Amino acid sequence: INKKSKNIYRKRPYKKNFFLFGLLFGFGFYLSGISWITNSLTFDNNFRVLIPFALILIPLILSLFMAFTIFIIGPFLKYNLQSLFIFSGSLAFSDYLRSKVLTGFPWNMWAYSTNWMVEFIQISNTIGLNAYNLIVITLFTSPIIIFYKNNSIKKLFSALLIVFTILTLFIYGNFEINRNKILLANIEKKIFVKVISPNFDLKYGLSENEIEQRFKKLIRYSDPDKNKKTLFIWPEGVFSGY
């Protein structure tokens, strides 16, 4: 093999490597994102044997969606803006398929990582979760523009486009929040919703006194107000032992 052909080989990895890269990245992505599901198997000692399978097999199976996606689009990706959109769109479509195949498994979507930014997620009410997920993936992968082989002007334009998108999401979300507050202020009959998340340990065989104490804590955490019609949502786990 001469030097020239060796350089070409290094720049063009085997397709199976794309599959492997996607599989490993997907496994780490889902392992870190849904490892919490094993907590439900610690409740009963009979289920503890399933923890290794839930911890390893579920992320591994889900990572196949990402592996096949990277396997298909990997050979066509380059250091340009078009490839960024192809990559982001393909991952978003992969998430969409994952939410539909075999009754659907729409967990750990990229968009969920922004649920703490109330202003940003408002747009999902208008364009839908999957479209918003596409925007989030594009923003997360946008730092790749620093490796583009384009001139500085095109890189600057791409960076400004990203900043503009972020500002637009924030401004729109802030507008929607304020608009909803005004609408709620003009509504006389309201029903409030309060989600309660106590830190009870799940136990069976509780005594009557323990059950009573648990109810008292739930009521205290709920902090009901007689002047407000409120729907309280308690997690099903709080009724363990009843």
Feature map (PLM): residue ranges:
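Soluble catalytic regions of membrane-associated enzymes that act on cell-envelope
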Residues: 173-242
